[in-house]
Regions:
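Amide-donor transfer/coupling interface in amidating biosynthetic enzymes
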Residues: 70-187
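Cysteine-nucleophile active-site neighborhood
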Residues: 6-72
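Redox-cofactor binding/interface segments in oxidoreductases and associated redox assembly factors
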Residues: 2-3
Length: 187
């Protein structure tokens, strides 16, 4: 099962209208689903619900394509991956790696110097938490950027995304093969 994110940015989990329904689904998945992948906002929500790990709100939304390091090269999830892979990130929160590592059932599989913890799994490999967006199309970050501009927000240009940091330039995709591998390996 995949539980995906939502553009809720700084909204506290308990303030989300459907938090009770979501936690019911998360609880149900523990007994009725072989493996659950929590993506972006849902990763932080899942870590909070299942393990009490508090999210840390960022002062500025993280948006762009960042280098990530595979820490556990023997993990079946990263079979075929290079040591370093690019992954889009688009989020207003993070978790402290130290908080994750305090939980014996959790293992950090990939990190980024710029984006922090990227992929976490449970000891039994029944839950995976992915903070980024390997599923993004080439124009998804652009659409988010222009959407936020249209809302009157002042978003930063997504890092490492538009050639020459110019939003008029077509983005170059550097994460597609990693995304294909990630989801194929997860399945």
């Amino acid at each position: 099962m995949i539980i995906t994110g939502a553009p809720l940015d700084y909204t506290k989990f308990e303030d989300v209208d459907y938090w009770d329904e979501l936690t019911n689904i998360m609880e149900w998945s523990k007994k009725h689903v072989h493996c659950t992948l929590y993506m972006c906002w849902a990763a932080f929500a899942g870590l909070y619900y299942h393990y009490g790990i508090e999210r840390v709100d960022r002062e500025e939304k993280l948006s762009g394509v960042y280098k990530h390091r595979v820490l556990k090269k023997s993990s079946p999830l990263f079979r075929g991956f290079d040591d370093i892979f690019d992954c889009p990130q688009s989020r207003a929160m993070t978790v402290n790696r130290e908080d994750v590592e305090k939980i014996p059932e959790l293992e950090v599989l990939a990190v980024s110097d710029a984006a922090g913890v990227a992929v976490i799994k449970t000891e039994d490999s029944r839950q995976f938490f992915m903070t980024g967006h390997l599923e993004y199309d080439s124009d998804t970050l652009a659409k988010e950027y222009f959407r936020d501009l249209d809302k009157g927000m002042n978003p930063s240009i997504p890092a490492n995304y538009f050639p020459d940091d110019n939003p008029e330039n077509k983005p170059v995709v550097r994460w597609r093969s990693a995304g294909q591998l990630f989801y194929s390996n997860w399945l």
